[in-house]
Amino acid sequence: VDPESPMNVRVELGDVENIGQIPNSNFEAFHEEKSGLTKKEDQADHWHSFINSETTALTSSAKMKHNWKSNDVRPGSTGTSSLEVKSRTVLGQSANGTVTTGRIKAGSITAEDPANCSYLDLSNTEKDKKGDPYYTILTCKPDAIEFWTKFFVGKREESNKDNIYATISAAITDGTYYQDPQDNDNYTNVVATAKNDKIESLDNTWQKLTVPFNYKETDKAAKAILVTISTCSVPGGGSLSDKDGEQDAIKIDDMRLVYNANATSIKFKGEELTEEEGVYYTTFNGEVKNSDLEVETDSKSAYVTKSIFNTEDGVIAIINIVSNDLKTANRYVILIEGATT
């Protein structure tokens, strides 16, 4: 591409597999996971559930099947499977169906106790039956997490009739121990978080959701991501039935981390510029510097560069915005008539 061509060019740098993405986020790969001699489930590769959770002597009954491989896929999918997660009952209590990129810890018989959590820790050397670790490495900084879901609210009683939402949460950390929900307010290893605890059923139809990340003011580097999905936003607040058709059930398909690279505002010497047929025009009689151009983007982590060139008609400024995963770039061209460098 000619850098001095007066065009706004969008460049797709290609889809390099798994860079900046969660492995198997399309939920096409599954393996059999077992607990003991009789308990087993089809578990999505790189994702984990209660069947391979950490338990205590009092909570060992939590190791039961919650996950299923489903052939019900989102509209327009090129794949053939999705992940289905269902609630179960344990000792007469509702056990929310949960899946995570980390590991589940069932540390208490009290549902709302933060000893019941998902966690990641890059120093953890344990692996699942397939050989995958209980964490997901991520060194990029996405702007949002996007996924397709179909949610069914199971049987409700008077005591839990208002508990009608599923939930997803994500945390990007520096890779040291982190759990969700947090057991204290002293975690300083968080880079960004995203959460939606109001996932509705919409009559059990497929819906596409996007949840933005909120970035912290921190010098910690992104090294890992913990994503957790649950059939109920209230711990132990879901269906009290283990019958098919009465359990809470959520299906997840085609998840991806979103990396933006768009300009939301371009200013020259404080004046907002508008685009006309792919070019931003303005006039100025005098010398132009890169610092005269202000750019705002829809990403806190995109890379922005500015260049200026003399032409017969004035100055052409080129603004390049590259997404944090380096897969997408946008170019913006500004013609400043009458100016010099």
Model-predicted segments: where are they?
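Short edge beta-strand/loop segments characteristic of extracellular beta-sandwich folds
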Residues: E146-K150, E294-E296
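Beta-rich interaction/scaffold domains
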Residues: D2-L13, N260-T341
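Extended, low-complexity, turn-rich repeat/linker tracts enriched in Gly/Pro/Ser/Thr and Asp/Glu
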Residues: F151-I164, T176-Q179
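Generic hydrophobic alpha-helical segments
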Residues: K34, V153-G154, A302
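Secondary-structure boundary elements
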Residues: P6, K150-E157, K216-K220
